Amino acid sequence: MKIIYTFILLLSISLSAQAQSYTSYFIGDTADVNPSPSSGICLMGGATEDDSAMKWFLNKANGGDVVVIRVTGSDGYNNYMYSQLGVNINSVETLVIPSVAAANDPYVRKQLRNAEAVWIAGGNQANYINFWNNTSVDTALNDLINVKQGVIGGTSAGMAVQGQAYYSALNNSVTSAATLANPYNSDVTIGYNDFLDNPKMKGIITDTHFDNPDRKGRFVGFIARCVKDYNKHFVGIACDEYTAVCIGSDMLARVYGGHPTYDDNAYFVVPDSCINGGMYPPETCISGQPLTWNHNNQAIRVYAVKGTPNGSNHFDMNTKKTGVGGTWKNWYVNSGNFSEGSIPT
């Protein structure tokens, strides 16, 4: 009996190891279609999705297949995308991909390669980097962006990982106070040039849930790290909750939200040197010391844009100097103290 029990136990373990490592939720036509999608990226700041921005995203799929990827959760997007927004698409599939093994599964690889649009759900961006980076997932996403010229988007953590540089949160979440006191704090974990390769996001880092006032200071710290560590110009894009930025082939960053009913904003955070030329890195950006990035109280120019239902307000990502419907501000930091001021018009 002991031998039989051991055999059954080993068989059970073997079958468990071979169990499907991902979960799929599917709605729509299972037959693959191959329309020509339109290039674009949709960045949402978290909380409830903005319907107008999501319609923009889905229309870029041109009637094709949409795949939602996440590490936890289930099929909350399927009916919303497939039938509630009035956009004709062939299918929506949510893939829950909670491990490297799942990310390298042949089915996951195939479905992502067949997609015309991919949406990265909210969650914990550290999981996305730990489980998806250097796997079939990021390879397929980069093929979607650069070969198929499809559309990609994400909310919250799904927005956070879209830039050439990104805050990975691999350790603990970090506050503005901790970042400004020491921009090399162990919780300020910045990834660079190793996940998504999107030409629209070169020299960009993002932040989300930005209507928490604490995030302005930490975002300046993130950008300071990028400028110092990689010796190149970097621009930040941040979104309040319920707010989205959509960038198409014209590189106009259209801002969607509920203004004037709600105070929904996106922020385009541009170091002054990007506008006026030259290279003016932070005066002090050293491990163990408070950040100083001042340059006569003009270190960083910020274009704050109200998000509207029709996305008419925008920022020009071609020049990073002009926009419609926004106001300019200065942000600067002295010895770890964040300040902001208006720019005279």
List each language-model region with its residue ranges:
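Bacterial Sec-dependent N-terminal signal peptides
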Residues: M1-S21
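C-terminal and late-domain segments of enzyme folds
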Residues: Q20-G63, S168, S173-T345
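N-terminal beta1-alpha1 cap of cysteine-dependent amidohydrolase-like domains
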Residues: S21-A121
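A residue-level signal for conserved active-site and pocket-lining positions in enzyme catalytic cores
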Residues: V66, V118, S156, T206, ...
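Short, solvent-exposed loop/turn and secondary-structure capping segments
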Residues: N79-Y80, N130-F131, Q164-Y166
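Catalytic-core regions built around general acid/base machinery
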Residues: Q111-N114, N134-Q149
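Catalytic nucleophile loop
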Residues: W119-G122, I145-Y166
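Glycine/threonine-rich flexible loop motifs
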Residues: Q125-T135
